Curated annotation (Swiss-Prot):
Effect of D52A: Cannot be phosphorylated. Leads to significant reduction in CtrA protein level
Organism: Brucella abortus (strain 2308)
One GO BP annotation of this record: regulation of protein stability
Primary location group: cytoplasm
Pfam families: Response_reg
Disulfide bonds: none
NCBIfam families membership: RespRegCpdRBruc
Name listed for the protein in its UniProt record: Response regulator receiver protein CpdR
Record-linked PROSITE patterns: RESPONSE_REGULATORY
Keywords: Cytoplasm, Phosphoprotein
Organism lineage: Bacteria, Pseudomonadati, Pseudomonadota, Alphaproteobacteria, Hyphomicrobiales
Length: 120
């Protein structure tokens, strides 16, 4: 079973994503901030980091940057209302990260995750 680490500070969105991703067959470990997610990344491997960009304690771009230092093969997907930030070539976001802009259809999220993990 593929393991997803989810970092999303919006409680309702996080609960919704966890439920949907588990229903799609993924094991999901979730946190409401980047710092806690980063701590878990240091303890165990994941197939995908699914993260919001704007979060307290550590933003999603910094989390993704640090995560790929630990595991260069980790797939990264940003879910955000601030797509321009992630796509900015001057940002520290990993170059092969995917960005899904809020609002999005759950079907689109699951399809993008499946594509990323198949390519792994």
């Amino acid at each position: 079973m593929k393991r997803i680490l989810l970092a999303e500070d919006d409680n309702d969105m996080r609960r919704f994503l966890v439920k949907a991703l588990e229903k799609a067959g993924y094991h999901v470990t979730h946190f409401d901030n980047g710092a806690s997610a980063y701590e878990r990344l240091q303890e165990e491997p994941f197939s995908l980091l699914l993260t919001d960009i704007v979060m307290p304690e550590m933003d999603g771009i910094e989390l993704a940057r640090r995560a790929t230092e630990i595991d260069p093969d980790l797939k990264i997907m940003f879910i955000t209302g601030f797509a321009a930030v992630a796509l900015n070539p001057d940002s520290d976001a990993p170059r092969d990260a995917k960005v899904l802009s809020k609002p999005f259809h759950l079907r689109d999220l699951v399809n993008e995750i499946e594509k990323m993990l198949i390519a792994a």
